[in-house]
């Protein structure tokens, strides 16, 4: 099995190095790592820090947004399976091997995660708070609120040939849209292991914390596309406390030791 990891990055060199460090510690190495630089600062020095990793860099001439950049990456992927990851998230050791085993009986696999708030000290992120993010993934429930974490998820390359690429028209909800399209006709499986560390800012400076008029517009587009009806627009943290979400809470194996990832950026 050849696994292509696709990472979109924009001016997050320290976090990107932590992700690559976590990949270098995996028990199963990917076939290729495609880093799409969305017209940010050069990542060539980052590639040089990890010469043993099969890194290819795509430099976009203008900032195209994360969905278009991700599409550029997956179109270049030549592996049998594609694994996605945001540049500020990272994997625990053994994640890739576990997902490779799970996809043997599926077309699309996604793991649970730990949602972690970090503070940065001397270029390294240290965890301040952490919360298990593990929920049942029944298709009808996923039509109401998506608990799919794209980072660390893996799917067979042919899905793009069958259902297309990521939809920039729904912007923030590209992952929810892709999940629903895939789950409708293909074998999608949740892996009950929190082997992905998902960075989330309590201060609300990332997309998952942001709620605004444009985000509501994208949510409405998603709803119209899939016939989802009126969807909740409450803050992410508030939604997780709703009774329906409490009902969906699931058991999961927690594997992260809570230690920060010290990359080669600060050892070089």
Swiss-Prot record:
It comes from the Bacteria. InterPro entries: Glyco_trans_2-like, Glycosyltransf_2, Nucleotide-diphossugar_trans. Signal peptide: none annotated. It is an enzyme of class 2 (transferase). GO terms for molecular function: glycosyltransferase activity. Keywords: Glycosyltransferase, Transferase. Its EC number is 2.4.-.-. Pfam families: Glycos_transf_2 (PF00535). PANTHER family: GLYCOSYLTRANSFERASE, GLYCOSYLTRANSFERASE 2-LIKE DOMAIN-CONTAINING PROTEIN. Belongs to the glycosyltransferase 2 family. This is Uncharacterized glycosyltransferase YwdF. The gene is ywdF.
């Amino acid at each position: 099995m050849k696994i292509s990891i696709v990472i979109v990055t924009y001016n997050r060199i320290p976090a990107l190095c932590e992700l690559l460090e976590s990949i270098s510690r995996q028990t199963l190495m990917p076939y290729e790592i495609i880093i799409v630089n969305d017209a940010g600062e050069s990542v060539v020095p980052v590639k040089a820090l990890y010469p043993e990793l099969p890194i290819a860099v795509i430099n976009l001439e203008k900032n195209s947004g994360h969905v278009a950049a991700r599409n550029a990456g997956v179109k270049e992927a030549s592996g049998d399976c594609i694994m996605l990851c945001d540049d500020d998230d990272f994997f625990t050791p053994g994640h890739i091997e576990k997902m490779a085993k799970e996809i043997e009986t599926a077309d699309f696999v996604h793991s649970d995660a730990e949602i972690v708030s970090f503070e940065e000290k001397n270029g390294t992120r240290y965890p301040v708070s952490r919360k298990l993010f593990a929920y049942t993934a029944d298709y009808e429930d996923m039509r109401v609120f998506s608990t799919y974490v794209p980072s660390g998820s893996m799917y067979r390359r042919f899905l793009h040939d069958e259902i297309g690429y990521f939809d920039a028209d729904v912007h923030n909800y590209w992952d929810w849209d892709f999940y629903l399209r895939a789950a409708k006709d293909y074998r999608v499986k949740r892996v009950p292991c929190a082997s992905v560390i998902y960075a989330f800012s309590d201060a609300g400076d990332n997309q998952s914390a942001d709620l605004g008029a444009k985000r509501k517009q994208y949510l409405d587009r998603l709803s119209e596309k899939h016939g989802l009806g009126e969807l909740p627009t409450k803050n992410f943290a508030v939604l997780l406390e709703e009774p329906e979400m409490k009902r969906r809470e699931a058991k999961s194996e927690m594997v992260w030791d809570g230690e920060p990832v010290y990359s080669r950026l600060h050892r070089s």
